[in-house]
Structure formats: C-alpha cells, structure tokens
C-alpha cells in the first residue's frame, strides 16, 4: 500500500531523518486530503529535507527535490508552499533543486566539465530556486573596502505579495547553503 515512505527517495537507500519523515508525511496527507493537489502530487517525491534556524526567531524547512521533477514542483509551488506552511506553523518552506558540483578537471586531463556542474552555475541556480516564485530581474555585486563582497538581487515586484514576508528567511537559507552574502530587494519604480 502507498505510504509516506514513497514520498522520499534518498541516495544509496539511506534512512530518512525525522525531519524528512515529517515532510514526506505532510506531502502524503496533502495528496490524500487536498483534491486540487492530488493529481499533481501523485508522482512527486523529495530527496532531502532540512530544518534551518535563521537569524532571530525565524525557522525554515528547506526541501530538496530531484532535478527531473523541478518543473512539476514549480507548477504547483505557490499552493504547495501555502499548504505546507500551514502544516509547519511558523516555519517558511523553501524548495531547492538537488544539484551536484564537480571539481575542476586536473591539468592535462581530457575530460570536460559541463557548465551546469560548476560551482558558479549551481550557486546561481540555487539563488533562483530560493527566490522562486519571484523572478530575478537584476543583480549587482558590491565590493566593500575590507575586501568582502555582497550581492544585491532585485526581484520582480509582481510577486511581492508572495515573497516579501520571507525575504529574511531567503537571505539566511542562501547564506547557509552557499556561504555567500546576499540582499534581496525590489527595484524602485520611478
């Protein structure tokens, strides 16, 4: 019979953690109780889920989804996030696609590394995942006098209602995932 275990598939058949079991159970419950999400959630599963404590009293649940299922998750993203945030009260839910970074090839090696497996490409894609459903309309990198750098990311103002309440969480999650400082803003319309 179907169960919440079918909603999580980890690498090398590793045992799911307590957090991952909670998320899988929530997805399974949504599939069984929510009629509008039932057909879309039927074939979807997750790879990993992590609870993160962000600065202050904010908490987030970061859910990793397989690259193949990225489009399907994005199609139902706003509704799914709304339902999951109800279940995990007080926690922001962020979906991130599972991606791998390959190390640069050794000198003299004949192998080519695909562009989408480079560190830069994976971090940029993670930034898009964290900011979703808002679209990134611009980026500026600011170098400070002490040598540190901070990236300003401008989000599309159309999705302001869906994303504004969790900007602080998005900054904290991106910093924990990549180690880079980022600031999310909405461009000022003149």
Curated annotation (Swiss-Prot):
Ranges in coiled-coil conformation: 17-50
One Gene Ontology term, aspect cellular component = cytosolic ribosome
What Gene Ontology biological process does one annotation of this record name? translation
> Looking at the record's lineage, which domain of life comes first?
Eukaryota
Pfam families (UniProt xref): Ribosomal_S7e
Q: Which UniProt keywords apply?
A: Acetylation, Coiled coil, Ribonucleoprotein, Ribosomal protein
N-acetylmethionine found at: 1
MF terms (GO), sorted A to Z: mRNA binding; structural constituent of ribosome
| InterPro entries for this protein | Ribosomal_eS7 (IPR000554), Ribosomal_eS7_CS (IPR047861)
Q: State the similarity comment.
A: Belongs to the eukaryotic ribosomal protein eS7 family.
The protein in question is named Small ribosomal subunit protein eS7x
Taxonomic lineage is:
Eukaryota, Viridiplantae, Streptophyta, Embryophyta, Tracheophyta
**GN (gene name):** RPS7C
